[in-house]
């Protein structure tokens, strides 16, 4: 089966044909680094992490780029309110973001360009747009003139008349059209700024991604991804800038967008008290379980996210890791056809995950001779999705970083004391130790090789 992907630009599923099969190029809009990543961010990055994994499985080389926006109004505001220098805010928050995504088990992108290291490329692109008549300078700003691009609005399916009608009542007097958007803005006192032909200033948000994609992936590349909320204005404006600057029919051949996330039926919001950062969830749950919960719905569909969903995902992973635990042999296997076919069908994760459950069920029904092969198929299938990558014993012994729990040395000491009690036929003491451990969330399992343990 060939890979098919839903293209927001055409509103249809299409067979994916890479521009260069020897190097598939993927770009995803990354974080603006001013605060902790929240679970909505994590949904988007988990979806495109899976896409990158699948592409790397299917093609010899994939260049996966995901940017860091490190100059932005929100960053400046955070710096001014906290008193922390802008460089400190962005460095600290970028490190937090990396730690959180690593804990979820996401791959690092092949390229992670930062906006502030691409200012010269942005200035050069803005200059080309001005020279070609697509942009103009006014009062220290440079603006893209939307009427200069007749088919502006193709991605979001918005006409220019709709854009003008939807513009704010008070339009900046220097704008030629209410729909025009900023490419460059003057820096206010105390704000970061760079020298340019239009004075000291900083780039608009949209030009950043256009310049970075061109620098690392070329004028036209294969896939551009992001959240559904970025279709307009961000991605629409990226397309306008890039196509007009380079004279191309498209910026990316395929545009993909992940759906919205709600919390127990409500929009996630700090005022409703249902706003979860990734870091908060990692204090309660393993990162692998959070990511499985995020992939439980199809990436384009709305996802109603709850802690109960994460707990269910944890139980599923317990079952899958349980298949691998204690086996002397797990046979190497190819990814099963039905799992690969599900993922090649526009990343159909609910179907792919259902096949993982079927493999686990088949394992438990199988005889001893068939089990190593079934375990190998489960490991290969889950591995393509980025799961079952750790040692099974480490999984069962793990505890979220923000929770209290006995350390391994204390648990092993208790197991040894129980072993000695059983040897002395003091079964009451052995049972007491088992019960005491269970009260603290430690489950003992006696087997031919001795006693193993896991966290409940």
From Swiss-Prot:
EC identifiers of the protein: 6.1.1.16
Signal peptide limits: none
- Lineage: superkingdom: Bacteria
Alphabetized Gene3D superfamilies for the sequence: Cysteine-tRNA ligase, C-terminal anti-codon recognition domain, HUPs
- Locate the motif 'HIGH' region: 31-41
Q: Where in the cell is it found?
A: Cytoplasm
Disulfide-bonded cysteines? none
| Catalyzed reaction equations | tRNA(Cys) + L-cysteine + ATP = L-cysteinyl-tRNA(Cys) + AMP + diphosphate
Q: Where does Zn(2+) bind?
A: 29, 209, 234, 238
Look up the record and give one Gene Ontology term from the biological process aspect.
cysteinyl-tRNA aminoacylation
Return the GO cellular component terms, semicolon-separated. Answer: cytosol
Give the family, as the similarity comment puts it: Belongs to the class-I aminoacyl-tRNA synthetase family.
Q: What is this protein called?
A: Cysteine--tRNA ligase
Q: Which organism is it from?
A: Rhodospirillum centenum (strain ATCC 51521 / SW)
Q: What is the lineage of its organism?
A: Bacteria, Pseudomonadati, Pseudomonadota, Alphaproteobacteria, Rhodospirillales
Q: Which gene encodes it?
A: cysS
